[in-house]
Amino acid sequence: MSVTKVHARTVYDSRGNPTVEVEVYTKDGMFRAIVPSGASTGSHEALELRDGDKSKWEGKGVTKAVSNVNDIIGPKLIESKLDVKDQKAIDEFMIKLDGTKNKSKLGANAILGVSLAVARAGAAAKGVPLYQHIAELADMKKEPYVIPCPFFNVLNGGVHAGGNLALQEFLIAPVGAESFHEALRLGSEVYHKLKALAKKRIGSSAGNVGDEGGIAPSLSTPFEALDLIYDAIKEAGHEGKVKIAMDPASSEFFQGDKYDLDFKNPHPDAKNKLSGAQLGDYYKTILEKYPIVSLEDPFAEDDWEAWTNFFPKAGVQIIADDLTVTNPERIQTAIDKKTADCLLLKVNQIGSLTESINSAKLAYGAGWGVQVSHRSGETEDTFIADLVVGLRTGQIKSGSLARSERLAKWNQILRIEEELGASNTIFAGAKFHKGQLL
């Protein structure tokens, strides 16, 4: 079944910035996808095409990307008569049409919008749910499907929030839950305790939320943040069942050859500028004190030496995001250098569904885990909820239990778990790192 019409438009993400929405039509109907965008982006990501016209949207317009879909990709795709069930052929067709290494001609945001909408059309053409279609595209085992352990970003720092806290994300993972339904309940209960505790200890403004729905209190050190979270877990009665994870997003505070933990402070203290080795020791102190199970982007995207030195001593899951940007070449280098053991999978970093699947399978082949991720500039699109189930990754982060663009993903996974039923699902829980093997 081929595409009969393609239409793109500008819509808005959760930050109020323009982004690309694409509608693909077949004889089965209309299929839509919206492209997300990040704030802390890796410099090696595929190019998100923005207009750069400062007189409109502060230069963040996507009218060029929208035009590229409507005037170039759409007509060529219709003319090609490619079958929407053949995701690989369509994605490769668009990549060839672009002709650049990082999709800078047409824009990764233009290509990805079409790619994801086509996947929905392909699922409909086969008469199967999107997660099943993705599993078949990836040659993954299907039933019982693996339902992921959610990682909730409950406290925001770094470039996602105010205050002086350098590290970007503090997450909770209900690894001791029996199901996704229970994991959401545990997460919700801890989140509400955390908000109440923060307001009590810091003031009413401490309950304000950041870009991803976590609270964004004015804190200075990760120890303050982790104490709050650990106390909230204990007060909720879920100690042991709910663990902690962190994403420092270290590329954001890597300056010269040092990591500046005071980078948000207008009056920084020189003693807070650390070498890679010193930062590694700092993390080890944190890991010894708190029930942490995962650490993402502990070092900057090109500080290979710090990654390689730290990984063997870490003792927890180490996730590569800015280091690998879902790019097969970067992933292979990271594997060869033994820098991490988990890939953060963001579809808009690479720019097509097929390439995202290939990146996940490359990571799996090296014995790595894969964590599917949203972006900080999100929308109501729920594609990644089906993606995480289809790819059996066993883990996903999609913000907190606040803000509808985050809850959209959590609620979709709830629906999938319910639709499949207990006999056809395995909740990853504490085995989140090896979801694909369950």
From Swiss-Prot:
Binding site for Mg(2+): 247, 296, 321
Annotated compartments: Cytoplasm
Coiled-coil features, chain-numbered ranges: none
Cofactor mode of binding and number, as noted: Mg(2+) is required for catalysis and for stabilizing the dimer.
Assembly mode: Homodimer.
EC number of this enzyme: 4.2.1.11
Organism: Candida glabrata (strain ATCC 2001 / BCRC 20586 / JCM 3761 / NBRC 0622 / NRRL Y-65 / CBS 138) (Yeast)
NCBIfam families: eno
Active-site residue numbers: 212 (proton donor), 346 (proton acceptor)
Pathway this chain belongs to: Carbohydrate degradation; glycolysis; pyruvate from D-glyceraldehyde 3-phosphate: step 4/5
Membership in a protein family: Belongs to the enolase family.
Catalytic activity: (2R)-2-phosphoglycerate = phosphoenolpyruvate + H2O
A single GO cellular-component term on record: fungal biofilm matrix
Cofactor(s) the protein requires to work: Mg(2+)
GO terms (BP aspect): glycolytic process
InterPro entries the UniProt entry points to: Enolase, Enolase-like_C_sf, Enolase-like_N, Enolase_C, Enolase_CS, Enolase_N
PANTHER family in alphabetical order: ENOLASE
Protein name according to UniProt: Enolase 1
Residues that bind substrate: 160, 169, 296, 321, 373-376, 397
Domain of life: Eukaryota
Top-rank EC class of the record's enzyme: lyase
Keywords: Cytoplasm, Glycolysis, Lyase, Magnesium, Metal-binding
Record gene name: ENO1
Annotated SUPFAM superfamilies: Enolase C-terminal domain-like (SSF51604), Enolase N-terminal domain-like (SSF54826)
Single Gene Ontology MF annotation: magnesium ion binding
